Amino acid sequence: MAGVKSLQPRLISSFLGNNSIRSTQPLIHLFRFDLGRRHVSMQLSRTFSGLTDLLFNRRNEDEVIDGKRKRLRPGNVSPRRPVPGHITKPPYVDSLQAPGISSGLEVHDKKGIECMRASGILAARVRDYAGTLVKPGVTTDEIDEAVHNMIIENGAYPSPLGYGGFPKSVCTSVNECICHGIPDSRPLEDGDIINIDVTVYLNGYHGDTSATFFCGNVDEKAKKLVEVTKESLDKAISICGPGVEYKKIGKVIHDLADKHKYGVVRQFVGHGVGSVFHADPVVLHFRNNEAGRMVLNQTFTIEPMLTIGSRNPIMWDDNWTVVTEDASLSAQFEHTILITKDGAEILTKC
């Protein structure tokens, strides 16, 4: 599909990095966030085909912000960490082309649900352990090393590693970084906030979760953003259940963000997750009129990203790291949930 000129890029997923998605939908639909797909099957191209420049304003990294906080700068990225041969790897790791969002809902049987619970619990344990490492002076690369080791010691594979060329086992997004921060040599500083996004592949199923942690003494403005972002996720999960419209998730999150005058990032979405890392449904975190209802025994993520200032993203030249255009703080929380007859079960909760 990469060479078909009539096809236009359409959607950025929650974890796509330097990959374009193509479908038969016109490009303008991307900017209107018209995500009605009518069962369009999508694939990724390793060439970005200008999509990054269309979606993300690339700005000079030397722009300055107020004197209270230094603008985030990239550090040195260490070599990719090895994974023992006995660890089962997701199919995309050895592929020359990263997968996109797979069309079609995955509805789990009893065994699938058990596997999802196991991967979700492990992801949650790793996430919480990583949070204990957040201290001034600790580098995000050190956090990545600890996460990597804990995952493989438990017989699982760190899902981000090798996904479309992503070089690390976890995403670490500090301060104005909205998502997909690459762990590097930068030491955390007192007052930072950091989102740690963990996904594990265990027994053929992915468990996906993230949380934003405080580093040292964090000011009240940052604390409030983090607390409200967590509240938005909790409220969204509370309304989920069989037959509920997906669009209600976006309304709940957007309404709470508006109440506190926060921005809601639109370019990144929640998604189905299971035996495939990213699948239907596409879960929007802002108000929308998209069709679709939740189905018993399906699993998907909800992962709102709220900002104090501009909700518009800038992508760094690494084609992964996404930051707010005005360097304002961003926070995110994420859970994988299972739709049950009584509502929703949080799978990524210890």
UniProtKB/Swiss-Prot annotation:
Top-level taxonomic group: Eukaryota
Ligand binding (a divalent metal cation 1): 197, 208, 334
GO biological process: N-terminal protein amino acid modification; proteolysis
Chain positions covered by the region annotation Disordered: 71-90
Tissue distribution: Ubiquitous. Preferentially expressed in green tissues.
Subcellular location: Plastid, Chloroplast; Mitochondrion
HAMAP family in alphabetical order: MetAP_1
Name this polypeptide is given: Methionine aminopeptidase 1D, chloroplastic/mitochondrial
Species assigned in the record: Arabidopsis thaliana
Gene expressing this chain: MAP1D
